[in-house]
Amino acid sequence: MLQYNKNHSSTWQTFRRLWPIIFPFRVGLVVASITLILNATSDALMLALLKPLLDDGFGKANRDVFVWMPLALVGLMGIRGFSGFASTYCISWVSGKVVMQMRRALFKHIMNMPVSFFVKQSTGTLVSRITYDSDQVASSSSGALVTVIREGASIIGLCIMMFYYSWQLSLILVLIAPIVSITIKLVSHRFRTISKKMQSAMGQLTSSAEQMLQGHKEVLIFGGQHTEKDRFNCVSNRMRQQSMKMVQTSSIFDPLIQCVASLALAFVLYAASIPSVMEMLTAGTITVIFSSMIVLMKPLKSLTNVSAQFQRGMAACQTLFSILDLETEKDQGILDITRVQGHIIFDDVTFFYPEKNTPSLYKINFSIESGKTVALVGRSGSGKSTIVNLLTRFYDIDKGRILLDGFNLNDYKLASLRNQIAMVSQNVHLFNDTIANNIAYARRNFYSRESIETAARMACAMDFISQMKNGLDTIIGENGILLSSGQRQRIAIARALLRDCPILIFDEATSALDSASEHIIHKSLDTLKKNRTSLIIAHRLSTVENADEILVIENGYIMERGVHKVLIRRQGIYAQLYKLQFSS
């Protein structure tokens, strides 16, 4: 579950932050506002036609009224229809633009967050933020804006008309205004609280569904259908409960406002029955005033609901701004190098993972000469992958320093640093695209078709690619679901081969390959590693026997170091791991 800054800003402060996103589309807002006012005015004017119809048309039998009134009605209906279309189109255009801008800003910001951020958050929750919450901001806010302008204009127009015909009766409306405003203020806070809980529940709902879909094979093989069903039932019920709380609050709120308005209507009827007042009223006047008060019920009801609608949008907006306020990866380096030599030094490096009290790495010291290969071996959780995470600056060290070609790692621009590194890990991620575009990921316009095919051939991937109907242009599905694990790993190796970086990182790069394919690929990797600095993490110790140096990591410490033969003769941890592996 997401945990963000809890310094909740007010609705006004949140809206002030949202306004710069809306402002570039102000022309659409202005046009929408004008047409909404026209729409509301046409409704009020059609109601005003009742007075001349009753007093002059029927009361005085004036036939001229029946000549111009149909034309007026057609004209007003035409204005009403055009203004309704224009306002809906403009509001939809503005809200669509705002949703797009919010999603783009959020997507870009999340993409530049440090790795530690993604460790704490579920994918489903983040997807919910990008899709559901950003849509809530625009749809709720635009809906509230439409209601405020159109219904507000209706109320103002009707009130002006009522005061024009009889200010005495219309003064009764003044009595209900404070009651309505106090009620809205009291309920607004509850609407906002429920909205935030609904967003949290939606994130949990998305996360639960996403976990089941991603791990459906594990669910089937371990018979976890009942567990996943119970989990999803729980979060979906939580979502339902929050929705019902919103409905409950709104259902109580609406009748309360309508009761207040009904009392005002009753007072008008009573006041109209007073003889001194009746003398000043005609049938048309009292009909217009009474009809106006009845018609006022609808915009009053809509305005009571606008608080819930607006608070829902502002609550979602505040959640998104909470993410946007989080600090992205630190990138204060100034060095922008085309190609480094690849001389790496870890100097007394100590590192703690966030929220952990014990160091994952403690006083690590080693160096890799340019063009040399260093292997990291050890049991799972010993700290091997952490060293890789620090070299790529997925995390920043707490103590010590890491040097690359004599410069501190922090002195390099992040993009420049990572352009020097090609990495193949055991957890391969492929995109829902063609094989060629996956191999040339992020640089598809930089490499030729021939170079992509050469990389695929060196990675022993052309064996299965050539058997596919579309070859390199085959779409492989989300995360390469149409490929086997071994095929996916070969694509990842081809991607690393194509990048031609001076630093190579292999984190169990051939773990999903059969022995024959692994033997062939290692020949290609040996060619690739020439004149390049290589860092290899391996559990299969046979793959690191030719490394220039082997570091044995245990509980965050370097326990042993040396070449394969020397470490075997020492009969230490490495020798034990080696014997254990080959005896099995």
UniProtKB/Swiss-Prot annotation:
Binding site for ATP: 378-385
Chief localization: membrane
SUPFAM superfamilies: ABC transporter transmembrane region (SSF90123), P-loop containing nucleoside triphosphate hydrolases (SSF52540)
The ABC transporter domain, residue ranges: 344-580
InterPro entries for this protein: AAA+_ATPase, ABC1_TM_dom, ABC1_TM_sf, ABC_transporter-like_ATP-bd, ABC_transporter-like_CS, ABC_transpr_lipidA, P-loop_NTPase, Type_1_exporter
UniProt catalytic activity: ATP + H2O + lipid A-core oligosaccharideSide 1 = ADP + phosphate + lipid A-core oligosaccharideSide 2
Signal peptide positions on this chain: none
One example GO MF annotation: ATPase-coupled lipid transmembrane transporter activity
EC number: 7.5.2.6
A GO CC term attached to the entry: plasma membrane
EC category name: translocase
Location within or outside the cell: Cell inner membrane
Cited Gene3D superfamilies: ABC transporter type 1, transmembrane domain, P-loop containing nucleotide triphosphate hydrolases
UniProtKB keywords: ATP-binding, Cell inner membrane, Cell membrane, Lipid transport, Membrane, Nucleotide-binding, Translocase, Transmembrane, Transmembrane helix, Transport
Sequence intervals crossing the membrane: 18-38, 65-85, 155-175, 252-272, 277-297
Domain (ABC transmembrane type-1): residue spans on this chain: 30-312
Family listed: Belongs to the ABC transporter superfamily. Lipid exporter (TC 3.A.1.106) family.
Record PANTHER family: ATP-BINDING CASSETTE SUB-FAMILY B MEMBER 10, MITOCHONDRIAL, ATP-DEPENDENT PERMEASE MDL1, MITOCHONDRIAL
Function: Involved in lipopolysaccharide (LPS) biosynthesis. Translocates lipid A-core from the inner to the outer leaflet of the inner membrane. Transmembrane domains (TMD) form a pore in the inner membrane and the ATP-binding domain (NBD) is responsible for energy generation.
Domain comment, as recorded: In MsbA the ATP-binding domain (NBD) and the transmembrane domain (TMD) are fused.
Complexes and interactors: Homodimer.
Protein name: ATP-dependent lipid A-core flippase
Protein species of origin: Blochmanniella pennsylvanica (strain BPEN)
Gene it is expressed from: msbA
